[in-house]
Amino acid sequence: MADSLVLLTGATGFIGFRILVELLRQGYSVRAVIRSAAKGQWLESRLTAVMKGSDYKDRFQTTIVADFVTDGAFDQAAENTSYIIHVASPIVSSDNPDDWEHDFKRVAVKGSIGVLEAAKRSGTVRRVVITSSMVGLFSPKALFAEPSEVPLNAESRIPEMEPPYAHKMLAYQAGKIASINSAEAWIKHEKPAFDLIHMHPSFVTGRDDLATTREDLRKFSSNWHSMQIVLGHKNPIGKPILTCHNDDVARCHVSALDPKVAGNQSFLISCSPEDGSEWDNVKKIVQREFPEAVAQGVLPNDGHMPTVNKGVRFDVRKTEETFGFKHIPYEAQVLDVVKQYLELPEKDEGVEISTTA
């Protein structure tokens, strides 16, 4: 492990940064892909704050790849690496549906195939791990509408979705589906010396060590699914309560580098919702654990988001048995995020609210 260099994309994001920290703590050397020198400086500052003097600096480096879809974009970055973990997703700012086929789908496929081609050209890469999503495996109907006759598992594959897309989430899903299908087809056709593993997390929740203020945590991420309720927002659009802790996501990605884990397979990452689970149950948890913050109005705790398809079920036994852990339950996920929110200052303020948990 000590001489194993991992190329990591997406290190400046919520999931990727947690994977970066876990890699360094496990003794790996990491070359993080960044899009600009400024991003690299910011990443190093956050890493210094989180690692708190740990002996890691001689095992961490950055490399700039400004455009992920350029031919050969990752070739130089992948040189002399043993593993690649590709977490980065397309950055999409357009609200024009005419742009989404390119921005979500084609860019996602180009990025994944570009990573695989760079791994092949390197001659040193032994395994590539790609971060996908649960939406890359299952249809919208299976996730949002139909109770599971049998628990859904990571062996599922579905045909690609074609435009037009009714909303951004469908375009995002189309990109994830196309990416995994294209990557697996590439592996089958090229038969490279390395293998491929896909990770499929559900809605990722947990402490975000890139956040330095409460305002950061109020910006949209998958943590927002729960925090919007805690902070008093009322969202009419429902979602299934399928979540996983960021620590578990990082654990699975890093553990997947172990050669004892067979390659060319997928893993579903999600805790199992208990019967009767609803997003709005977060209000009971917060009232019980943080009564002072609720009384002060720091946590309004009166929001709402509908829970849809309470009958959906996942089979994550393969994930837990392969990597030797049990998924962190939803309540612990929520507590980690709310505790962090209360610990952090508001923007440009230094006031912290005491907690009871």
Swiss-Prot record:
Q: Which GO terms describe its molecular function?
A: oxidoreductase activity, acting on the CH-OH group of donors, NAD or NADP as acceptor
Which positions bind NADP(+)?
Y172
Pathway stated in the Swiss-Prot or TrEMBL entry: Mycotoxin biosynthesis
Q: Which InterPro entries match?
A: Epimerase_deHydtase, NAD(P)-bd_dom_sf, NAD(P)_dehydrat-like
Q: Under what conditions is it induced?
A: Expression is positively regulated by the cercosporin cluster-specific transcription factor CTB8. Expression is also affected by nitrogen and carbon sources and pH, and is also controlled by another transcription activator, CRG1, previously shown to regulate cercosporin production and resistance.
Q: Which UniProt keywords apply?
A: NADP, Oxidoreductase
**Gene knockout outcome:** Abolishes the production of cercosporin but accumulates the naphthoquinones called cercoquinone A and cercoquinone B. Leads to dark orange-red mycelia with significant export of colored compounds into the agar.
EC number of the protein: 1.-.-.-
Any single Pfam family the record assigns to this protein: Epimerase
Top EC category: oxidoreductase
Q: Give the protein's function.
A: Ketoreductase; part of the gene cluster that mediates the biosynthesis of cercosporin, a light-activated, non-host-selective toxin. The perylenequinone chromophore of cercosporin absorbs light energy to attain an electronically-activated triplet state and produces active oxygen species such as the hydroxyl radical, superoxide, hydrogen peroxide or singlet oxygen upon reaction with oxygen molecules. These reactive oxygen species cause damage to various cellular components including lipids, proteins and nucleic acids.
PANTHER family, per database record:
NAD DEPENDENT EPIMERASE/DEHYDRATASE, STEROL-4-ALPHA-CARBOXYLATE 3-DEHYDROGENASE, DECARBOXYLATING
Family membership: Belongs to the NAD(P)-dependent epimerase/dehydratase family. Dihydroflavonol-4-reductase subfamily.
Q: What is this protein called?
A: Ketoreductase CTB6
Please name the gene that encodes this protein: CTB6
